[in-house]
Amino acid sequence: MQLFTHIYQLKLIPPTGIVNKITNKKGKEIDAGSKTARNFLIKMIDNKTEIEVSYHAKRTVTSGTQIGLSFEQISNMVKGAVGVDGNTLGFGMTFLHELHHTTIGGDYHDSTELFGTGPVVDNMNIIRNELNKQGFNYGERLNYKAIHTKEGNIIPFNESALTSLKYNSSMGKKAHYIKTK
């Protein structure tokens, strides 16, 4: 959990498994990280339904109460970040994204349109925007699908990248995106 502290502002107390909000010396909750992510994660932890998480999937996929995370796929997205923090589609954010697909997370579905976001990406963009306001660079995901181009499969994180994709042109210097395999 330490790896994702800047996103959630929660700490796990081993070996009890108790999750607490991070507080200052006076016991007041620190208003940092994403409040939306923190509240969503607490809601998931408080739910009695267990979610099974696997880290050995070939591709990241979710069904019902099972999440399969692909170490290779997520690592490639982190490495493929251009103009945004690689963690914008890193392990913490991908885990939160996939939780939205579970039965306890809303059972939301991703957009099937060539260009569009859908409810999961929209919820994740709220989290990204809360982090961006604190000086992080998570961008705003403007399309769910990675669009195949001659440069690779591209997920746009600003208008410059989205426009380049819509007009089938090369990514410009101002484009923020994640290139995937």
What is the role of each PLM region?
Residues 1-54:
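A metal-dependent hydrolase signature that marks the N-terminal structural subdomain at the beginning
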Residues 15, 25, 31, 62, ...:
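Intrinsically disordered, low-complexity segments enriched in small/polar residues
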Residues 15, 26, 47-58, 69, ...:
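Long, low-complexity, intrinsically disordered regions
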Residues 22, 32, 41, 53, ...:
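Extended hydrophobic/Leu-rich segments
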Residues 45-92, 102-106:
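Active-site scaffold of zinc-dependent metalloenzymes
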Residues 95:
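An amphipathic, basic-hydrophobic helix/alpha-beta surface used to engage anionic
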Residues 98:
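Walker B catalytic acidic pair
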Residues 103-181:
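Active-site or metal-binding loop neighborhoods of secreted/extracellular toxin and effector enzymes
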